[in-house]
Structures are given as structure tokens and as C-alpha cells.
């Protein structure tokens, strides 16, 4: 395991995937490599293919390659492009959505407002535009979608207006000034009563928009299911409702269940392609919460392909 990296819900993931000798597994969010390493160590001749679009993950992947040789393959790829890969027939597929601890802790990446840095927020700095540029050029509709929908921020109107007014001033260029601008847009009474930093939700929304995180999830889940062998298991870890919602709806659809209360599709027209392994999301146990507070909002869903 990479020093300082604690893979979330590891016990539970291994319990559902149940790695077997010579099994083949796909880790779509390599990150620190903790889940991948645990799979490789779980049984003889296990093989793992891992994806990550962050170039910072490559040295960690190279270290695993030195240890496990051809049993481990790393692909420099966004999981939103999973359908492009020729690989298939996996015994298990894992997603661990959201920003990684490494990305949060690397100040210069601009994911956190706790340290001043260029407001970048890209999971792959080689593609797309940094958050600072996105904020300067995004349409009103794009800003509203990011702050209101992706950030779930009730004061979205004030924040969108503040961002528009700050264009061309340099205030959107760095995390500290951006966080200050967002906080100032929120009424003082709500700022002081909040349990989280007032810029938290807006930063989340901008990050999701810059990286097309929800779009990638919606593309990746059906692609991952298609790559499962019969009897293969799909595990999905999410950290907030925006990530969990498409996973929940996809799982229910694959299991022949209504996707929501508004889903009026007759039961005889539904096709059951999988069995649910989790009736409700699995959350971290008390010992994991004590050892890794960042795991507190994690939820795990699992299904088995028929």
C-alpha cells in the first residue's frame, strides 16, 4: 500500500469481489493503488487491469508493476472512455468515485481551498481547461449547473453573480481568492451557522463540471457491466448523492427494478440482468471511520451479473 493511502471500504470490497486464483479484475479508479494491491495479494495468480487519467498515478502503478509483473496492467485512461478498451470477461470491476486523497493533498493541483494554489482542479492536467479559465468563460447555464446542481448550493444565484462580476479581476485565478469570493457571496448568518467551509459545495460543483465527472459515471457503468463475465461482480463506491444517484438507478435497472418512484415501466417489460448484493449501500464500520475520517461519506453498492 502506498504510504499515507488508505483504500476506502477495502474489507467490504474484497468480501464482495471474493478474489479467486487466476481471477481477472478491473480497477477503474487506480488512485493510490490500495484496492489494486489488495486484489493482487488476495489469491494466487490474480490479474488486475487498472485505469487512471491522473498522470500522478503512473509512478505508483510502476511500483506495482515491479512487484507483480505481468499480473498487473496499468492503462492511462479516463474511465469515461472504458467502452473503448478491448478487455472483457472480468470476474470483478471496481469504481471508487470522486477526488482522491492524493489529489486533495497535492496543494498545487488546486482541488482544496485550505491552501492557496492556482485554481486548476483537473484530474488530468494534460487535457481540458483549468477551473480558473472555465470560470472566466463558462456560460450562465454552465455556472448554474455547476453551482446549483453539482454543488447543491442553496445560494447559487449569489455565487454565480459574484463569479460573473469577478471576471477579468484575477480573483478566479487562485483557490484562496476564489474561496474568499464565494464565502463573501453567502449571507453572514448562513456563513457563521454552517458546519462546513462556505466554499465547499461550490468548489465541489466546479470540480465536477471541469472534469465531467457525472457524464463519465453515466458512460462508464454500462461499459463496465458489459465487461463482466457471467457471475462477475460490480462494486461502486460513491461519496455524495450526485455520484450515488446514477449508480443506484443503473443497479436497479440491471436488477429489473424500477429506477425511481416515477418509473412506470410495467414489470413484465423489465429485463433482469443481475442480482443485487447490497439491498442498501454499505458504509464504513466504526474502526475504519476512526482510522480514516475521510471515509465517513463513502457508500458501497454491489451486484452480480447473471
UniProtKB/Swiss-Prot annotation:
Residues 280-306 are annotated as: Disordered. The keyword Protein transport does not apply. Transmembrane segments: none annotated. Its EC number is 2.1.1.199. S-adenosyl-L-methionine binds at residues 33-35, 52, 79, 96, 103. The keyword Phosphoprotein does not apply. GO terms for cellular component: cytoplasm. It is found in: Cytoplasm. This is Ribosomal RNA small subunit methyltransferase H. The gene is rsmH. InterPro entries: RsmH, SAM-dep_MeTrfase_MraW_recog, SAM-dependent_MTases_sf. Belongs to the methyltransferase superfamily. RsmH family. SUPFAM superfamilies: Putative methyltransferase TM0872, insert domain (SSF81799), S-adenosyl-L-methionine-dependent methyltransferases (SSF53335). One of its GO terms (molecular function) is rRNA (cytosine-N4-)-methyltransferase activity. It is an enzyme of class 2 (transferase). Specifically methylates the N4 position of cytidine in position 1402 (C1402) of 16S rRNA. Keywords: Cytoplasm, Methyltransferase, rRNA processing, S-adenosyl-L-methionine, Transferase. It catalyses: cytidine(1402) in 16S rRNA + S-adenosyl-L-methionine = N(4)-methylcytidine(1402) in 16S rRNA + S-adenosyl-L-homocysteine + H(+). One of its GO terms (biological process) is rRNA base methylation. Residues 296-306 have a biased composition (Basic residues). The lineage of its organism: Bacteria, Pseudomonadati, Verrucomicrobiota, Opitutia, Opitutales.
Amino acid at each position: 500500500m502506498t504510504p499515507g493511502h488508505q483504500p476506502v471500504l477495502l474489507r467490504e470490497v474484497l468480501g464482495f469481489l471474493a478474489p479467486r486464483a487466476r481471477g481477472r479484475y478491473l480497477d477503474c479508479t487506480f488512485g493510490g493503488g490500495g484496492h489494486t494491491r489488495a486484489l493482487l495479494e488476495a489469491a494466487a495468480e490474480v490479474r488486475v487491469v487498472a485505469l487512471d487519467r491522473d498522470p500522478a498515478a503512473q509512478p505508483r502503478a510502476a511500483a506495482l508493476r515491479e512487484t507483480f509483473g505481468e499480473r498487473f496492467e496499468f492503462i492511462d485512461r479516463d474511465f469515461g472512455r472504458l467502452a473503448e478498451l478491448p478487455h472483457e470477461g472480468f470476474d470483478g470491476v471496481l469504481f471508487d468515485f470522486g477526488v482522491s486523497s492524493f489529489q486533495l493533498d497535492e496543494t498545487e493541483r488546486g482541488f482544496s481551498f485550505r491552501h492557496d494554489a492556482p485554481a486548476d482542479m483537473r484530474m488530468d492536467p494534460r487535457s481540458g481547461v483549468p477551473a480558473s479559465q472555465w470560470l472566466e468563460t463558462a456560460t450562465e447555464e454552465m455556472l448554474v449547473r455547476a453551482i446549483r446542481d453539482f454543488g447543491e448550493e442553496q445560494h447559487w444565484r449569489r455565487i454565480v453573480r459574484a463569479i460573473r462580476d469577478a471576471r477579468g479581476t484575477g480573483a478566479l485565478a487562485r483557490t484562496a481568492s476564489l474561496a474568499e469570493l464565494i464565502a463573501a457571496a453567502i449571507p453572514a448568518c448562513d456563513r457563521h451557522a454552517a458546519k462546513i467551509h462556505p466554499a465547499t459545495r461550490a468548489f465541489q460543483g466546479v470540480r465536477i463540471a471541469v472534469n465531467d465527472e457525472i457524464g463519465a459515471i453515466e458512460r462508464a457503468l454500462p461499459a463496465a457491466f458489459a465487461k463482466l463475465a457471467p457471475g462477475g461482480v460490480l462494486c461502486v463506491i460513491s461519496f455524495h448523492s450526485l455520484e450515488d444517484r446514477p449508480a443506484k438507478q443503473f443497479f436497479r435497472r440491471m436488477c429489473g427494478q424500477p429506477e425511481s418512484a416515477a418509473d412506470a415501466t410495467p414489470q413484465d417489460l423489465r429485463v433482469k440482468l443481475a442480482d443485487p448484493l447490497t439491498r442498501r449501500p454499505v458504509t464504513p464500520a466504526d474502526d475504519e471511520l476512526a482510522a480514516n475520517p475521510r471515509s465517513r461519506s463513502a457508500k458501497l453498492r454491489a451486484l452480480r451479473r447473471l
